[in-house]
Amino acid sequence: MPRYAFRIEYDGHPFKGWQRQTDLPSVQGAVEAALAKLEADVPTIAAAGRTDTGVHALGQVAHADMQRDWDPFRLAEALNYHLKPAPVAITACARAHDDFHARFSATWRSYTYRMICRRAPLVHARGHAWAVRGTLDVTAMAEGARHLIGKHDFTTFRATHCQALSPIKTMDEIRVEEVSLPAGTEIRFHLKAQSFLHNQVRSIVGSLEHVGSGAWAPDDMRRALEACDRAECGTVAPPDGLYMTGVGYDEDPFADGWKDT
């Protein structure tokens, strides 16, 4: 059966996460329902990462084995038609190698977290960013984030029910970006690693908010990391501001396929 790779964008707000769940809306369920409109034997779709309830994606990658050969453009068009009105879109599609696996072939994953600092409530970004009242020290947050670069035990920054066999992860990049808005300031946290623990990004961002507000010193991020104790984590940031932005592979699975431009 021919295997196809998909790049998927979605608004996580109406879904109970990526993973299919009985009687609950999920992104996987929405995509598989669209696939069911195209082939009698509904393909199972596997993703690079299982995002949680309310988490969004700009560059989720998934694959599925189809019953027949499809032109990638026509397959993407058909899926996007049947996905409506769900806030899910296929933005790239390609015929993949038979041994390609969206999750296990991935060499890195990237996430961006959006935080908007202002007194007024969010309107257009409501449900798509963390609203923080007051100002934050971006320089201090960037200094605190540097303590997390490299290979560490991230027990402090993972959920207590995380199922990963090991808390050891290598953080390749944490970058803090400040963007001026007409009303307020947006702070974006860009993180990149081969893989992440459950709630790792949200735990890190919530702790960095403590640094930005002055409740923690930048060095407190190192202290919390070295404690290897979940109780030493700061606030866990809400899911609203988290976006899965990309997945990397040794070979671009979409190099010879269709990509929206």
Swiss-Prot record:
Protein task: Formation of pseudouridine at positions 38, 39 and 40 in the anticodon stem and loop of transfer RNAs.
Keywords: Isomerase, tRNA processing
GO biological process: tRNA pseudouridine synthesis
Active-site residue list: D52 (nucleophile)
UniProt record similarity statement: Belongs to the tRNA pseudouridine synthase TruA family.
EC number: 5.4.99.12
Residue pairs linked by disulfide bridges in the UniProt entry: none
Record's keyword annotation contains Isomerase: yes
InterPro entries: PsdUridine_synth_cat_dom_sf, PsdUridine_synth_TruA, PsdUridine_synth_TruA_a/b_dom, PsdUridine_synth_TruA_C, TruA/RsuA/RluB/E/F_N
Catalytic activity field: uridine(38/39/40) in tRNA = pseudouridine(38/39/40) in tRNA
NCBIfam families: hisT_truA
Gene this chain is encoded by: truA
The protein's name in its UniProt record: tRNA pseudouridine synthase A
Gene Ontology molecular function, alphabetical: RNA binding; tRNA pseudouridine(38-40) synthase activity
HAMAP family given in the database record: TruA
UniProt-annotated binding residues for substrate: Y111
Subunit structure: Homodimer.
